[in-house]
Every structure is written in structure tokens, then in C-alpha cells.
């Protein structure tokens, strides 16, 4: 009868020593050493074929593996230089000839600081537009919606397990 194996149970030393493959039990220690030596020889022959000597970890990279600096430059085929010549026009032209948009003469020294003058102008503009948000205090009563009138015939309530009107 097979025993159930607990996967959290630590195996005993005896079960660890048993080989999993039954054919592996027939290999002696001398055979293992011979196989290891054969693998080492094959690795040495392969490294000699590739031109590397010794351990691959200790090898320095070859100088011919580095790409030449001239090959790293990417040419600008079909692109003009970013510098603008005098005959070229800029991408965006700003017209500053018209002073109609913003009059700076109003903000000159007229007794008010520029911040006060801008604040007055903003208040005037808000009054012209019909917004008096800065002058009207926030009233919480304005935010509430009054309840609708309830007619006495539509009043139904639940009392002591019975619906009543």
C-alpha cells in the first residue's frame, strides 16, 4: 500500500540519496568522473576553436566588435538645416502694430497701483456683463429647494404594521 506523501514534510536523508532513474544506479563514481572530464575537454576544444583562451568570464571584449565612430553618424538626407537664412520667413509672424487689443496707457501712474486699476477694470467688466458675483454674499438659503406642498389625501404612513392614510 502506498503512503501518502506530505508535500510540506522534510524528506529523510535516505530518500534523498536514492536515484530517481533506475539506470543511473548502475553508474559508478569512476564513470561520472570520466564523463565530467570528457565534458571539460569538449569545452576546451570549443573555446580553442573560437579563438578564446581560458575561462570565458575572464576574457576581454575584442576591439573589432566596436563599431567605428563614422558609422554611428546618421546623415540628414532631404532635411535642411535648422538655422534660418535671412531670406526665409519665420513659421509664426506676430503683428504688434495694432494697439487696439490692449491699451497700456490706462495702467500708467494715475494715482492707483496697476493691481488696483486691473481690479477696478475687472469689476466694471463684471457689472457690464451682468455678473455681480463678487458683491453678492453667498447665502446658504438660496441653495435650498423648498419642499412641495403635500395634499392631506395623499399622505400615507406605516404605523404598528398597518398602512394608514
From Swiss-Prot:
Residues bearing Phosphoserine are 55, 85, 98, 105
User: Which Pfam families does the entry mention?
Assistant: FAM219A
InterPro entries given in the database record? FAM219
Q: What is the lineage of its organism?
A: Eukaryota, Metazoa, Chordata, Craniata, Vertebrata
Recorded family membership: Belongs to the FAM219 family.
Where N-acetylmethionine occurs along the chain?
1
Gene giving rise to this polypeptide: FAM219A
Question: Span of the secretion signal?
Answer: none
UniProt-annotated stretches for the region Disordered:
1-114
Report keywords, A-Z.
Acetylation, Phosphoprotein
Residues recorded with modification Phosphothreonine: 96
Species, as recorded: Macaca fascicularis
| Listed Basic and acidic residues bias regions | 32-44
Name the record gives this protein: Protein FAM219A
Could you tell me where the Low complexity compositional bias lies?
105-114
Bias regions of kind Polar residues — which residues? Answer: 49-63
Amino acid at each position: 500500500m502506498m503512503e501518502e506523501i506530505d508535500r510540506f514534510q522534510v524528506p529523510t536523508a535516505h530518500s534523498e540519496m536514492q536515484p530517481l532513474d533506475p539506470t543511473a544506479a548502475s553508474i559508478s563514481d569512476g564513470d561520472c568522473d570520466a564523463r565530467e572530464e570528457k565534458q571539460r575537454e569538449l569545452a576546451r576544444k570549443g573555446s580553442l576553436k573560437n579563438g578564446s583562451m581560458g575561462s570565458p568570464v575572464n576574457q576581454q571584449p575584442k576591439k573589432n566588435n566596436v563599431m567605428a565612430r563614422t558609422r554611428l553618424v546618421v546623415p540628414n538626407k532631404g532635411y535642411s538645416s535648422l538655422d534660418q537664412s535671412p531670406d526665409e520667413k519665420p513659421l509664426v509672424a506676430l503683428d504688434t502694430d495694432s494697439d487696439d487689443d490692449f491699451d497700456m496707457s490706462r495702467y500708467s501712474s494715475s494715482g492707483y497701483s496697476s493691481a488696483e486699476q486691473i481690479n477696478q477694470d475687472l469689476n466694471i467688466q463684471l457689472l457690464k456683463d451682468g455678473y455681480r458675483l463678487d458683491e453678492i454674499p453667498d447665502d446658504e438659503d438660496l441653495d435650498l429647494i423648498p419642499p412641495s406642498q403635500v395634499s392631506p389625501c395623499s399622505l400615507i404612513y406605516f404605523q404598528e404594521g398597518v398602512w394608514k392614510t
